[in-house]
Amino acid sequence: MRDLLSGFVAGLRSLAPSRFPYRRFALALLLGGIGGWLFVQARLPLPWMLGSMVVCTAAALLRLPVAAPSVIRPPMTMVIGVMLGAGFKPDIVAQLPNWLPTLAGLVLFMIACAIACVGYFRRFGGFDPVTAFFAGMPGGLIEMVTVGEEKGGDARIIALIHSARILLVVMTLPFIVQWIGGVPLGGARASGPSIATTPLFAELTLLACGLAGIVLAHWLRMPAKFLLGPMVVSAAVHMLGWSDSVPPFEIVNAAQLILGVTIGCRFVGTTPRLILRILALSLGSTVILLALTLGFAYLVARVSVHGPVPLILAYSPGGLAEMSLIALALHMEVAFVAAHHIIRVFLVMISAGPLFGLLIGRKKPGADPQDETAGGEGKGESER
């Protein structure tokens, strides 16, 4: 508990005017808001997330003075966790047996993605074995960067590849879902009650779920504690029938805006040349991943009670929060989508290290003749 309080105090200190780039963050929010508004006017899917993401990525590419410091993410991540937990309903336990075929398909899907993407980055990216392995694994960004750096990989390349993957998947998947499922994602009014009409007790209940979830996750040493902890507590409260409150649509829009801004600003501080190269490489890997996603979704749909569209969202190689927000916008079973992404990240997290040791062993990345292409180019770039 002391560590949690220390982290909270450190977070408050980082908000001091001398340490927090308020002007650059305000510009990022302004540009993100303009992007979201433009996407709303164009009736495009998930406008506040995609619009802010596209504009902030362009701003980073143009080297505009934008920034989204990491300290702003935990509070919004907590909100998203509570929001996702609210999608778990009391009847969810009865549906768990129906998830067995889809979870089995998920394991095979992950293996296929890892083999295809690691090989792709080795052959076309010229990455050293360590960097290619952790850039190609379909796991969470933070986990893959942390373990990859420990094993001797280029942490910045791994981070940029996973950031670009999430960027490209989130930008393209809503349109794919709209095209395949005929589901209208854009132009509709946001669902959920307004914050002005939501009872104060309901809002306090959701806030309590978030705070209690952070404490629980810290105590249990859960990964992604600001997301998973609040989601677990909120899910328990909603599954037990103690609350049926859902977040106001203004909070949902704000979550989309902040997510889009933070994803776009991940490329700040990296040269345009490296950004374009990473985006080009990630475009190829994203095509591979989405092709595998569609293929496995349609195959598994034949042996399960779930249709292709929810399976596409459950298997898609995007982030947990981003894919769950898309499911929320589609009025689909958020619990189904979120659970599959949690299991995917968990399985990759516990298996990546041992699998790396089994396949690559103690081989040094510097011994590979292709190292100069990927790691060498990144070494001279400015740090993010």
Regions found by a protein language model. Give the residues of each.
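Membrane-embedded alpha-helical segments of transport systems
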Residues: P138-M144, I158-G181, L292, L320-E322, ...
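Alpha-helical membrane segments and immediately flanking helix-loop junctions
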Residues: F124-A164, H306-H340
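Transmembrane alpha-helix boundary signature
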Residues: P65-A68, A86-W99, I115-V130, Y298, ...
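C-terminal transmembrane helix pair
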Residues: L289-R384
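Cytoplasmic-side transmembrane-helix entry/capping segments in multi-pass membrane proteins
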Residues: P69-I80, P101-T102, G126-M137, A159-H162, ...
